[in-house]
């Protein structure tokens, strides 16, 4: 706290500000400081408020030892000066007897007699105050359930009583009753009791997160697997990193351990490492540690005891080491509770959890399903391939010669040989063979550098690839191999050309590179056929890449000319790999030239050749291209078949014959065209994981971003959030080492998912942070405009209209630098509706100012469109949305409609209706109707027109009391829509007309 409050007004302001903070040490320390400040004032009432805030901070900050001490001070004040406590303060005081009971129960050092004495005091106080005793019996039952003695009687004494205003909330009592049935072994009855909470009908600060954590295993045991999965995702988010809900986190870890999700369990454990240090409640700590031990025990039993695990701060842990530590601490805590209670109940329940067998072998909890092998420090081993790779020779000379022979063919097994040789050469005791056939060590080092350069190129590290190829060329020169040197320099040219940015620059670089390549080729003599074919292929590739960037008709013929040279030469010398490679490039060139049928014909001929003559390892890549051509020809099913076959065949080959992640992404695209988005989502996440295993992290995170957006589009909000939470927790992302824009995109999608999941507070905080960061993106003001606009809408939904206006102004300023007409106009209209809806007439001027801004942006869009500078798609926000207000809700549809002018007119109508300016509203809505015109039988905006008519009828008939013209309008619209076959759209109009007639 910067400065202590100097008067009681400042104290109350500080207490209110602290109340808005999340529970934790910051809030608790501030509450302690405010109590110190309150003690300086002569008035005792501010001290009461400060003590109440401090007790709340201790209670929900998991510091049960301190809560009773604070309450004792409050009780003394009440006994000494009861008149200081108004009705609200008195209510809070008697409510918190239960908090103290709960706090004392969590402390094994408090004797059982002390707990019973407190319950007696609570009963006597309640009786003296004339309060019902149901809350007292509720606390007595909780103590009985904790000790395991006389539980049935205590339950009946509590559950049979009528609730009072001091009873715990419905959600908490539901959880308590359900847990009673759960302890008795009746899963079905427990779940039936829980249903209102699990369905979201009853909730509080701790619910449904607490109930969800207990219900997960019963749901599995009763076969409700999918619901358990969904509730795990939503429920975990409600308790993670929260010291007062450490037990709930422990049960989620246990759920992961018993469903084959041990890797996710370790990930969640790392996310909650703070709970080892921040949980001051022994009972909560025991609950958490037992869940941790269930997880670690399972991981260790699967043979992964040496995996790293996140544990108590101050040292590094393995799974086995942490399990031993956790077991010791948890056993000690359980023993202390049982000693206090005089029973073995706590230890017995702990043992029952540890003895549970897995309930499912493998439940796919999240879109990012990972195994323990995936989280191991060492690179995961590749899955066994159906095709058996040729054995790597044992003799060093044979191995070197074999690698070169395979490399000459372009065989995928080459990589395994080079990898083995790289390890051998790096050994301190390496001795190079004295074999003329093998050649000198410098030649082998050149070979290895060439392979390393190829790997860099596969990871799109073109600068590194170019440098390594040049270095390899120099070594080949030293070894007396000018042909190899020429190929390396040619490949370096290609890598350098990849580094150019922008289509024009890239085309120029590729043209120059081709000239240099031809000169290099012509100046190198004595080339063996396979090397000459490689140089010819490089020449054709450079021109093919130029065509890809320019799509210029004049660049088509030169590519085919080079390909003709390659095909003639490779056919004459029977260089099979370059024949098929050239034919593949020929098909690609036809596609780039816009002749997809010709491209498909070329591919079909090539596939026939490959199946009869080989090389077989070219089949996956060729099928992949064929699939992409089929997509271009609108045959998604044929494309899917080709991609699936390519993926199957690619698994038969080692190395990087074809990029499996690209094929998986292609499969996802085909699935989207086939209307199978859930399958597409699975392929996208597999593609991302494949890229991660290949250490292509940027590609992986881009694909994860696409998967997250798709899951959000599909309404799988919790899946989206869980996926992004996992990705954002990756070490390089968390450390800020990933590209900041890509990280921002991941966070932006997560913020949108939080909003869709109705976690408005978290979504607003993330959007505000992103808006602040993106304000510094001088090279990308358009993105800042979009983010700031979305932030403004969220702030408006939260009622923070001053901050919303600031964010909207930022968006408008950024929009001037990089126009985002559609997005910004949409946000401004939504803000107008929000402010008018929430503030009524008081908010009308500010709301109309937003619409004026939206109108100016619409004018800009129209001018830009007419000038050919931008194509701005108009949209109509008219939405047939149910809401409490007669004139609809503030939601703005993104459905495209007839005109932006119509959209603005409609919004003016809604905003003025919210602001009770009904004449202006009616005029605007009639204008919107006129601009829309009556829909025809095929128009898909009939529903929007009907909603506009309905709102006009509401304003005219209900608010302005002009029933007759309103009925005329409504009846005419119903007749028109019925005649067109739009019966569904007539229902709200007919309902409004009936209401108006009833009120006549």
Segments and roles (model prediction):
Residues 14, 34, 47, 54, ...:
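Structural register within alpha-helical repeat arrays
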Residues 32-39, 72-83, 117-127, 156-164, ...:
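Amphipathic alpha-helical segments of tetratricopeptide repeats
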Residues 16-27, 56-70, 85-86, 98-115, ...:
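Short coil/turn connectors between adjacent alpha-helices in alpha-solenoid helical repeat scaffolds
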Residues 5, 45, 131, 168, ...:
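Residue signature of alpha-solenoid helical repeat architecture, marking inter-repeat boundaries
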Residues 2, 276-423, 430, 464, ...:
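C-terminal non-catalytic interaction modules
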């Amino acid at each position: 706290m910067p400065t202590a409050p100097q008067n009681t007004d400042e104290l109350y302001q500080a207490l209110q500000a602290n109340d808005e903070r999340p529970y934790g040490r910051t809030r608790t320390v501030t509450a302690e400081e405010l109590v110190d400040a309150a003690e300086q004032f002569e008035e005792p009432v501010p001290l009461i408020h400060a003590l109440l805030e401090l007790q709340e901070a201790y209670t929900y900050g998991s510091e049960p030892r301190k809560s009773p001490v604070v309450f004792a001070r409050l009780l003394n004040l009440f006994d000494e000066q009861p008149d200081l406590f108004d009705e609200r303060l008195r209510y809070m005081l008697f409510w918190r007897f239960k908090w103290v009971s709960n706090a004392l129960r969590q402390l094994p050092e408090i004797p059982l007699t002390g707990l019973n004495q407190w319950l007696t005091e609570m009963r006597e106080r309640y009786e003296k105050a004339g309060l019902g005793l149901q809350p007292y019996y509720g606390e007595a039952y909780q103590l009985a359930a904790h000790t395991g003695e006389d539980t049935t009687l205590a339950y009946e004494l509590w559950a049979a009583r009528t609730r009072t205003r001091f009873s715990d909330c419905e959600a908490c009592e539901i959880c308590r009753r359900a847990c009673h049935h759960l302890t008795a072994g009746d899963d079905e009855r427990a779940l039936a009791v829980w249903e209102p909470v699990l369905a979201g009908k009853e909730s509080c600060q701790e619910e449904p997160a607490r109930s969800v954590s207990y219900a997960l295993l019963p749901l599995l045991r009763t076969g409700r697997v999918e619901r358990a999965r969904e509730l795990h995702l939503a429920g975990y988010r409600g308790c993670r990193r929260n010291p007062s809900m450490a037990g709930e986190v422990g049960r989620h870890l246990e759920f992961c351990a018993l469903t084959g999700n041990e890797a996710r369990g370790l990930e969640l454990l790392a996310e909650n490492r703070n709970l080892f240090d921040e949980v001051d409640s022994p009972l909560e700590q025991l609950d958490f540690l037992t869940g941790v031990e269930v997880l670690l025990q399972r991981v260790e039993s699967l043979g992964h005891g040496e995996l790293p695990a996140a544990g108590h701060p101050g040292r590094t842990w393995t799974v086995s080491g942490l399990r031993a530590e956790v077991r010791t601490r948890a056993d000690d805590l359980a023993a202390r509770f049982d000693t206090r209670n005089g029973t073995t109940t706590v230890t017995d329940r702990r043992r029952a959890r540890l003895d549970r067998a897995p309930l499912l072998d493998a439940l796919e909890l999240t879109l990012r399903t990972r195994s323990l092998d995936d989280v191991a420090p060492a690179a995961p081993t590749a899955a066994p391939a159906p095709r058996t790779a040729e054995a790597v020779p044992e003799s060093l000379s044979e191995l070197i010669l074999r690698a070169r022979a395979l490399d000459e063919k372009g065989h995928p097994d080459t990589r395994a040989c080079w990898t083995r040789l790289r390890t051998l050469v790096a050994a301190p005791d390496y001795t190079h063979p004295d074999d003329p056939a093998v050649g000198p060590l410098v030649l082998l080092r050149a070979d290895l550098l060439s392979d390393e350069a190829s790997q860099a190129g596969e990871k799109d590290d073109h600068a590194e690839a170019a440098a390594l190829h040049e270095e390899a060329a120099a070594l080949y020169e030293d070894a007396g191999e000018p042909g190899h040197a020429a190929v390396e320099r040619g490949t370096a040219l290609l890598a350098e050309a990849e580094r150019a940015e922008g289509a024009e620059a890239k085309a120029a670089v590729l043209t120059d590179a081709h000239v240099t390549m031809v000169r290099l080729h012509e100046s190198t003599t004595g080339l063996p056929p396979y090397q000459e074919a490689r140089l010819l292929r490089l020449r054709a590739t450079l021109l093919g890449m130029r065509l890809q960037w320019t799509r210029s008709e004049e660049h088509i013929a030169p590519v085919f000319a080079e390909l003709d040279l390659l095909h003639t030469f490779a056919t004459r010398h029977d260089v099979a790999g370059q024949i098929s490679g050239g034919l593949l490039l020929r098909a690609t060139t036809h596609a780039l030239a816009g002749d997809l049928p010709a491209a498909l014909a070329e591919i079909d001929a090539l596939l026939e050749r490959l199946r009869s003559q080989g090389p077989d390892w070219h089949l996956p890549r060729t099928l992949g291209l064929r699939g992409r051509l089929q997509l271009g020809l609108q045959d998604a099913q044929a494309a899917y078949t080709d991609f699936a076959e390519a993926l199957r065949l690619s698994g038969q080959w080692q190395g990087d014959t074809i990029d499996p992640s690209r094929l998986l992404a292609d499969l996802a695209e085909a699935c989207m065209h086939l209307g199978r988005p859930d399958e597409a989502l699975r392929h996208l996440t597999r593609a991302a994981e494949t890229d991660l295993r290949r250490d292509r992290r940027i590609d992986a995170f881009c694909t994860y971003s696409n998967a997250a957006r798709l899951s959000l589009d599909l309404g799988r909000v919790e899946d989206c959030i869980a996926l992004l939470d996992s990705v954002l927790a990756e070490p390089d992302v968390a450390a800020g080492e990933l590209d900041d824009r890509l990280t921002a995109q991941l966070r932006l999608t997560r913020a949108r998912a939080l909003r869709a999941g109705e976690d408005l507070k978290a979504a607003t905080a993330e959007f505000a942070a992103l808006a602040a960061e993106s304000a510094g993106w001088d090279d990308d003001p358009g993105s800042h405009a979009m983010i700031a606009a979305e932030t403004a809408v969220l702030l408006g939904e939260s009622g923070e209209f001053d901050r919303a206006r600031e964010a909207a102004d930022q968006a408008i300023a950024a929009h001037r630098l990089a126009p985002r007409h559609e997005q910004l106009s949409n946000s401004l209209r939504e803000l107008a509706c929000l402010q008018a809806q929430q503030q009524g007439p008081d908010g009308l001027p500010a709301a109309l100012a937003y619409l004026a801004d939206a109108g100016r942006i619409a004018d800009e869009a129209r001018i830009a469109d007419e000038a050919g500078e931008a194509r701005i798609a108009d949209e109509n926000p008219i939405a047939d949305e149910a809401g409490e207000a007669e004139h609809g809700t503030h939601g703005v549809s993104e459905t495209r409609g007839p005109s932006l002018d119509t959209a603005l007119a409609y919004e003016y109508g809604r905003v003025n209706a919210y602001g009770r300016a009904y004449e202006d509203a009616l005029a605007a809505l009639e204008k919107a109707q006129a601009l829309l015109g009556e829909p025809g039988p095929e128009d898909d905006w009939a529903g929007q027109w009907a909603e506009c008519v309905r709102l006009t009828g509401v304003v005219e008939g209900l608010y302005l009391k002009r029933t007759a013209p309103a009925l005329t309008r409504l009846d005419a619209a119903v007749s028109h829509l019925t005649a067109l076959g739009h019966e569904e759209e007539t229902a709200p109009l007919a309902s409004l007309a009936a209401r108006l007639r009833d009120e006549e």
